[in-house]
Amino acid sequence: MPHVIVKLWPGKSEQQKVRLAEEIAKDVTKILNYGEESVSVAIEEVEPQDWAEKVYQPDIVNNSERLYKRPEYAM
């Protein structure tokens, strides 16, 4: 606890994904005062043509009350 899930389009390198996960974990431990052993980060790649159905509608539109950072695009 906590577990962070990042959803993004495919195409980022393994090195970029590892670095992103490391930086997210560092910020979570620093801001929320958890030990690094408590933090997990998953990266889920979603194809651009599936984004509206698999991410935008269920995670952004249908759960807007849980968003702390909203995107500046609409679909």
Where do the language-model regions lie?
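A domain-level signal for the structural core that forms small-molecule/cofactor-binding pockets
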Residues: P2-M75
